[in-house]
Amino acid sequence: MSISSVAKRFAPAIAPYKKSLPLRNSSRFLEETIPRRLSLLLQACSNPNLLRQGKQVHAFLIVNSISGDSYTDERILGMYAMCGSFSDCGKMFYRLDLRRSSIRPWNSIISSFVRNGLLNQALAFYFKMLCFGVSPDVSTFPCLVKACVALKNFKGIDFLSDTVSSLGMDCNEFVASSLIKAYLEYGKIDVPSKLFDRVLQKDCVIWNVMLNGYAKCGALDSVIKGFSVMRMDQISPNAVTFDCVLSVCASKLLIDLGVQLHGLVVVSGVDFEGSIKNSLLSMYSKCGRFDDASKLFRMMSRADTVTWNCMISGYVQSGLMEESLTFFYEMISSGVLPDAITFSSLLPSVSKFENLEYCKQIHCYIMRHSISLDIFLTSALIDAYFKCRGVSMAQNIFSQCNSVDVVVFTAMISGYLHNGLYIDSLEMFRWLVKVKISPNEITLVSILPVIGILLALKLGRELHGFIIKKGFDNRCNIGCAVIDMYAKCGRMNLAYEIFERLSKRDIVSWNSMITRCAQSDNPSAAIDIFRQMGVSGICYDCVSISAALSACANLPSESFGKAIHGFMIKHSLASDVYSESTLIDMYAKCGNLKAAMNVFKTMKEKNIVSWNSIIAACGNHGKLKDSLCLFHEMVEKSGIRPDQITFLEIISSCCHVGDVDEGVRFFRSMTEDYGIQPQQEHYACVVDLFGRAGRLTEAYETVKSMPFPPDAGVWGTLLGACRLHKNVELAEVASSKLMDLDPSNSGYYVLISNAHANAREWESVTKVRSLMKEREVQKIPGYSWIEINKRTHLFVSGDVNHPESSHIYSLLNSLLGELRLEGYIPQPYLPLHPESSRKVYPVSRFIEKEMRDPDKV
């Protein structure tokens, strides 16, 4: 707009009066009407892009001597403030001495400072205003509160709240709304509730502020209660209200209330085609009512990208991956273009199927249609590639990122963990720390398992200190991850200490503690914690049951396992396929193969886990034929494809009965018939198969033929075979590898020492013992359990402190005699050095350890 156009617009209105009156003696029309009409034009120019036109209007007013009164001057000042022209604003403010005219000029400048991000200047200008004796009004405080929130100045908010209360403005809905929103931003609920109660006239806007604040703070029950009070006060909800309450219904799965709200939306006449339709779709989807969601979707006159996204994300979050992909195809067919949110929601379904080619196709679509790769889509792509085993593609995406934040770093860390690249995962975390990005909860939960796997206890303690410093130690998910990390590092005492410190223990934390105790050779502690869990009022789930059954299997304690089995039947938990599979394992390890088979036969649903459990049970009891029959039944009749665990159990079964040919045949069948690549465990099992049969050359050739470096388990298996068959030369090769791969494992030192002792190489035995002392490796004593009259008794190898130790060893000698009659030939005790050979030790003190060695290897 030019100055000429302004003149043309107002010339007809001024012309009749110019003839009769000089401008200096203007009429009331010129004094009041013209400035007020021009003020509308000034308001229209209150935009940074229209600053030039605003200055032209100002010039027009000056040329025609229309400006000069406080009303017009304040409007001009407001225009400059809205345009962010602080130099012109300051000139007018001080030249025309608007400092004491009214509060409006001060408010204009304060709001302009806040709007343009000059937050400290806004607060400073407020205090300058107070120095000039100008009192703030209800328009002043919302801007100041907004500035304090942006500056994260919580004390400033408290100061403003006290000032508002002292001035009696806390009952004003606009001032109260700004303060309520500020306190809720910091997660405070008590103060906003008091402020809300003091407001005299509560309208829908302030109710929406309160309800959305409750939802943001996680006080979902307060949202429902507040909405009920709002309805009783006869305040009509609007679309914002319904969106908030429907989101709470979706989060808490309150489908009945959600359906009632749907009816209320229809009755109230709120625009259904707005955001409410998406909130309703999300609510029905999250509550698992996909039929209703689909009907609602089909009834819509138009479905935009957001609406399609609601349906796709609902299917994905409910685990219905195939349906989400079908809906995506339908979206493309209908001509609606997907956006970044669409693919961020869809990619987890691609990850579920681990289809790398499909992942690449989606990536190509994103690039071809120039869809913006924001942080969330980038992390979703990285996560999808990692889960589809496309590690190099994920690395390429990360390297091409212009900017990365904690979300992308977390995707990389968890992706490396998923693919077993633990060192890379740890290096990525170190990179995150190096670039001074603070890890969030998900990052910590992702990196703690890596530290546990790598046994990096020192780093784990440092990270635990960081967690305490940041106040994350009371979060259940992080607490569980810390417990898991310490347990994997062999520090169960610290794990239990962390568990005891948790202020709130949910079912996940209890399950984590039970599982770790069961896996760390402390099954009795696992059962004790399982009992404590029940006493504390936490309901058991399938994970709790499975962990406790594993502990019973490791003790073994068949009586307690039977009690848990009865509990499962009574509380309808016996239909869970994973719990039943653990039950099979428990009965088998307790020696009751018949009960294990009965559980398997009565299972309504059988998956690969349950078949593997029963195959392993038969194999461990030396029933290879039964294992093979079950294998063929699984493949041919049930149509279930065997996995890596299946073949591991079959080869292990062959190992138990010494059927080398059958074991080798199944090992080859893995790759040739099923395309399954053998892992370290399979090679270790084949080495053990050859080793037990005395075919050490073939065992060593198997190790050398491995397509990847053998781990400590493989070399340890070979070393055990060398000790058994007195092959010192090959034992030297295996021991040198073990010293590099796992120098802290005492079991390998014992194997090496026994191999040398077999060959009467006492000097080498002494060296091994000295090496153990030098590296501070403590020999872990052997333990055994026996259950008598529903009570489990623990025995320690070589223990003479028990008051009835002489009677115990006498009984062991009697049992040894019975074993000899059955054909068992015990391995005589081999001393760690020649001087010890002069001492006499009862063989029975070492029977338990020697009998456990083959299973341990």
From Swiss-Prot:
InterPro entries: E_motif, Pentatricopeptide_rpt, PPR_At4g14850-like_plant, TPR-like_helical_dom_sf. It comes from the Eukaryota. Residues 790-820 are annotated as: Type E(+) motif. One of its GO terms (biological process) is RNA modification. This is Pentatricopeptide repeat-containing protein At4g21300. Gene3D superfamilies: Tetratricopeptide repeat domain. Residues 714-789 are annotated as: Type E motif. The lineage of its organism: Eukaryota, Viridiplantae, Streptophyta, Embryophyta, Tracheophyta. PPR repeats lie at residues 102-136, 137-171, 172-202, 203-237, 238-272, 273-303, 304-338, 339-373, 374-404, 405-439, 440-474, 475-505, 506-540, 541-575, 576-606, 607-642, 643-678, 679-709. Belongs to the PPR family. PCMP-E subfamily. PANTHER family: PENTATRICOPEPTIDE REPEAT-CONTAINING PROTEIN. It comes from Arabidopsis thaliana. Keywords: Repeat.
